[in-house]
């Protein structure tokens, strides 16, 4: 079967950025930046992004482009005879399924709230009534199931339409719209009464506030966010590397993807902080920020229905862009493992992903009795822990060791692949850090995640 390729360089960059850009850019990064000293946190975040995320992204892209295979088959094309690196390929596929087991539900929340806001169902509600809307949604398995299934159907239908005519075409439009909506929302925030105070809190470095939270805690938080924001370790980037030519170096392309992801994360704060300071609302993180705090602000804002609708449309696009990217990975792996057509692989995965996503939906209602808990939390929290604290760091470590050590693909092969084409290059002076320093940092992130979950 002849391998498909992306039609344009822009399509590759937007698809890769769409995979990296997700809800964490909005409901986690601004809060961490605000609490961690504003500009001080942002500065350290950018440093760690360059030191951690960027190199590993080049490695995923390199494995994909050199092999021209899906992640589940890529190692077999590059490893030496008798080696077992290809076992990790199956773990990348498992990680993608696990991510979709809860991400489809969260993406459904975004679509639900876009509908609720656009139709005016949240207009004029009191703060308690807005909070109650979120609680009622979680308690209703029918509503949760409907939106989750809709997300899966949308994702599979688009991917089944083909790489160029389906995934690439839709993602281009969606990502450009996402960026445009963000800019409009940010400009609107600049004209709010509390914009000056909010932007000062967010962007001006405040090392005193950083010390109040704890310097070590803030640095580890910046390191974790820089590492996890790019969705590395489960082959989600490698698949797009397999769809491109060798006209441009992979370091240069990775920089462009990282810049887009960072733009979205920082711009999210430009939207949120002025609004919170204008309306005297404590800035929180996670679902409470998105589904309680901000809807309350929109309810009291002039033209709040318009701005709220735009915000949740942006959030829906951010979630769907990740869903589409991971679906493409899953569907392509299915095609290569079974020899099935794109449409057949899409159809099988439509039902499989819906079935796998049901526990997350029911974990908030039907299965939410006191005796049912996974490590003391909801099903979503457990699935998120497995992906974020196991599959991403350990998967990234495998890609890293495969690319830079003589026991895998090897430094010279990696360097040759990543440097092919015009653009920024990887140099030999980086080898010591990538071979010795970076693996230790990734191991630290993994161990800290385990400690933070079970022993803190």
Mark where each language-model region is.
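Membrane-interface "cap" regions at the ends of multi-pass membrane proteins
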Residues: 1-27, 56-61, 65-78, 82-87, ...
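Helix-loop-helix connectors at the membrane interface of multi-pass transporters/channels
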Residues: 3, 73, 107-139, 243-247, ...
């Amino acid at each position: 079967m002849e391998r498909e390729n992306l039609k344009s360089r822009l399509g590759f960059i937007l698809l890769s950025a769409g995979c990296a850009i997700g809800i964490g850019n909005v409901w986690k990064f601004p809060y961490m930046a605000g609490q961690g000293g504003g500009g001080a946190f942002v500065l350290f975040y950018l440093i760690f992004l360059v030191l951690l995320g960027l190199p590993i992204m080049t490695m995923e892209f390199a494995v994909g482009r050199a092999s021209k295979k899906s992640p589940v088959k890529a190692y077999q094309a590059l490893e030496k005879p008798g080696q077992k690196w290809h076992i990790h390929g199956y773990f990348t596929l498992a990680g993608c399924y696990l991510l979709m087991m809860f991400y489809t539900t969260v993406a459904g929340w975004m679509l639900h709230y876009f509908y609720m806001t656009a139709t005016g169902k949240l207009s004029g509600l009191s703060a308690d009534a807005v909070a109650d809307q979120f609680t009622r949604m979680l308690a209703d398995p029918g509503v949760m199931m409907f939106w989750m299934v809709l997300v899966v159907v949308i994702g599979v239908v688009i991917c089944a339409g083909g790489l160029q005519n389906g995934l690439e075409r839709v993602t281009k439009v969606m990502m450009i719209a996402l960026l445009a909506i963000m800019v409009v929302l940010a400009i609107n925030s600049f004209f709010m009464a509390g914009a000056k105070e909010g932007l000062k809190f967010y962007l001006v470095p405040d090392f005193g506030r950083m010390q109040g939270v704890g310097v070590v805690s803030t640095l580890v938080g910046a390191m974790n966010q820089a590492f996890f924001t790019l969705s590395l370790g489960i082959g989600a980037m490698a698949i797009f590397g397999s769809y491109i030519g060798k006209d441009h170096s992979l370091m240069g392309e990775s920089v462009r993807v990282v810049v887009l992801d960072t733009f979205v994360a920082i711009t999210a704060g430009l939207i949120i902080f002025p609004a919170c300071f204008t309306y005297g609302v404590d800035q929180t993180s996670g679902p409470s920020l998105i589904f309680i705090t901000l809807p309350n602000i929109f309810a009291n804002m002039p033209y709040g229905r318009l701005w709220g609708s735009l915000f949740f449309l942006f959030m829906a696009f951010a979630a769907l862009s990740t869903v589409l990217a991971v679906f493409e990975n899953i569907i392509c792996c299915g095609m290569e493992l079974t020899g099935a057509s794109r449409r057949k692989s899409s159809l099988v995965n439509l039902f499989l992903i819906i079935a796998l996503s049901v526990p997350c939906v029911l974990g908030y209602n039907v299965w939410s009795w006191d005796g049912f808990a996974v490590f003391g939390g909801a099903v979503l929290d457990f699935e998120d822990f497995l992906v974020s604290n196991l599959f991403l760091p350990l998967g990234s470590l495998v890609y890293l060791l495969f690319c830079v050590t003589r026991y895998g693909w090897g430094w010279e092969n990696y360097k040759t692949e990543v440097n092919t084409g015009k653009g920024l290059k990887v140099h030999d002076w980086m080898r010591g850090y990538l071979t010795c320093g970076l693996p230790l940092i990734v191991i630290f992130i993994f161990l800290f995640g385990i400690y933070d979950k079970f022993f803190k």
